């Protein structure tokens, strides 16, 4: 009997109905979005919107496209990731359509639907073409170079609403920083995975914190400082805060040292205080946050933040109903930065709770997929991408609710913004790919030629016909950093000390009594 598959169910029973569950959830997500679309039309125009059928058909086609890509290339992926993304995207489209009724001359929902289609198309391309997420590890330095280049380019373009984050060419505009955040996350994950042992165990100890050696931590800190510096020059402090949060999370996951969280919070507070004093654009936002009702007292009317707070208060527990709010009073950026205020007013605390649970579930499944892997790069990549979504939701929701200063970022999938929705779909595609690797069942030991002897060690007169890198991803003997190396991905390490008794992907093998220990115990009792 072979150890890895002794208790495994037959191959046909390992993943019962996973894609069927996903398809059913997708149908529910499309149905909820279409019903909300119709509800808005009935509330505002006393009639079903004329394009409701085409809207539903388009959203269903996008959901089906994503489902087919996952079914054929990532059959073991988490069945919740794609439906949650489709539901969030559908809710965003119906909210933008609802706000378009307030500004008929400036309709944004058709354009947003096109961007959503492009995002789902890229989702399918990534899932179909990226067969192994470890491929990205080979292009770590290409990723950081491309990411920094994308962040530098907007400096040479005019500022829009006080920030230099846009590139406008022939009426077409996009935010390159949205794509840069994925590229820099790939670099951070690859670099920290390759150097995690040195980061965790070398360096000087100060107070109760052990700091890594400068030669190890220096390159990644330099890249982070450059990226944050560029963002400060562009006055895009929301994205700089996002990079900082993700960097601290990845550093903690790579080293396992909680002290980095404390250091990160202290540095964030110091940096925010310094920039808030030195940068007028940021200083005004901090002043609005500290005194949101000052403009009312001065007789200038309510500020955007004050109107946002009034909208949340008007929503109460159950909301005013879709299409029954007064979000137009927010004015500028009601479809982007302040779209959450519309959601809170019309669906209330109950709707907000459901929305935040969707985001929490999406982030949690991303973390789960990463932590189920024994590949350090895959683990850090999934955690980093999920953290991008988590920090972004916190920064935006905290800003419009008055918990922190406004940052001008876009709520994932919900707010108007083509660059944002496309980037978020790529993030979900990468999480789907990592999830498929983490959930893929074990191969048959007879097929791989790996025969387990006593204690889980390999035995046999001849070597197995497959090397570790020849097996499907996750079927190796230890941490697969892309070259069969252990603990950091350095090649050439022997497999003897790689936790041979553990199943791949972080799934622990069942505890079995050691016969030699039993004999020793019996002898001592005699």
Task: Outline where the language-model segments fall.
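Hydrophobic alpha-helical transmembrane segments
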Residues: 57-62, 116-122, 345-364
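Transmembrane alpha-helix boundary/anchor motif
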Residues: 64-68, 187, 273, 277-281, ...
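Hydrophobic, glycine- and aromatic-enriched re-entrant/interface helices and adjoining loop segments
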Residues: 160-166, 170-173, 260-355, 374-381
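Hydrophobic alpha-helical segments of polytopic membrane proteins
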Residues: 214-277
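Loop-to-helix entry and N-terminal half of a specific, functionally important transmembrane alpha helix
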Residues: 367-408, 414
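Long, low-complexity, intrinsically disordered segments
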Residues: 466-526
């Amino acid at each position: 009997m072979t150890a890895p598959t002794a208790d495994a169910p037959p191959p046909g029973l390992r993943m019962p109905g996973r894609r069927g569950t996903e398809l059913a959830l997708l149908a529910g997500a499309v149905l909820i979005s279409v019903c909300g679309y119709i509800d808005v039309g009935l509330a505002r125009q006393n009639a079903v919107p004329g394009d409701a059928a085409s809207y539903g058909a388009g959203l269903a086609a996008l959901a089906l496209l994503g489902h087919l890509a996952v079914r054929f290339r990532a059959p073991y992926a988490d069945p919740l990731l794609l439906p949650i993304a489709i539901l969030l995207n559908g809710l965003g489209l119906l909210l933008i359509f609802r706000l378009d009724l307030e500004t008929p001359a400036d309709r944004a929902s058709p354009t947003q639907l096109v961007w959503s289609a492009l995002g789902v198309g890229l989702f399918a391309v990534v899932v179909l073409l990226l067969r192994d997420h470890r491929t990205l590890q080979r292009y770590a330095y290409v990723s950081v170079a491309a990411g920094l280049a994308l962040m530098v380019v907007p400096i040479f373009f005019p500022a829009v609403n006080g920030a230099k984050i846009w590139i406008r060419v022939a009426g077409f505009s996009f935010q390159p920083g949205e794509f840069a955040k994925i590229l820099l996350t790939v670099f951070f994950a690859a670099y920290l995975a390759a150097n995690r042992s040195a980061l965790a165990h070398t360096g000087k100890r100060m107070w109760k914190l052990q700091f890594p050696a400068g030669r190890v931590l220096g390159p990644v800190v330099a890249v982070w400082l450059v990226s944050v510096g560029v963002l400060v020059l562009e006055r895009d402090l929301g994205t700089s805060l996002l990079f900082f949060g993700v960097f601290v999370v990845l550093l903690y996951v790579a080293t396992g040292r909680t002290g980095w969280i404390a250091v990160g919070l202290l540095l964030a507070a110091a940096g925010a205080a310094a920039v808030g004093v030195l940068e007028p654009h940021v200083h005004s936002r901090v002043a609005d946050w500290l005194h949101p009702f000052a403009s009312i007292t001065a007789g200038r009317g309510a500020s955007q933040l004050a109107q946002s707070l009034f909208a949340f208060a008007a929503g109460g527990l159950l909301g005013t109903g879709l299409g029954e709010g007064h979000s137009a009073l927010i004015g500028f950026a009601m479809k982007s930065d302040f779209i959450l205020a519309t959601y809170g007013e019309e669906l209330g605390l109950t709707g907000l709770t459901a929305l935040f649970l969707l985001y929490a579930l999406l982030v949690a499944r991303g973390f789960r997929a990463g932590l189920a892997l024994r590949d350090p790069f895959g683990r850090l990549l999934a955690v980093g991408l999920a953290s991008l979504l988590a920090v972004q939701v916190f920064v935006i929701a905290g800003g419009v609710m008055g918990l922190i200063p406004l940052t001008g970022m876009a709520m994932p999938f919900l707010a108007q913004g083509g660059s944002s929705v496309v980037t978020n779909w790529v993030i979900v595609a990468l999480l789907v790919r990592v999830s498929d690797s983490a959930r893929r069942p074990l191969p048959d030991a007879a097929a791989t030629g790996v025969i387990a002897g006593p204690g889980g060690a390999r035995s046999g007169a001849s070597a197995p016909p497959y090397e570790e890198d020849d097996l499907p991803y996750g079927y190796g003997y230890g941490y697969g950093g892309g070259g069969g190396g252990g603990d950091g991905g350095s090649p050439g390490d022997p497999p003897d000390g790689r936790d041979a008794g553990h199943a791949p992907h972080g799934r622990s093998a069942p505890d079995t009594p050691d016969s030699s220990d039993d004999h020793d115990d019996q002898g001592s009792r005699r």
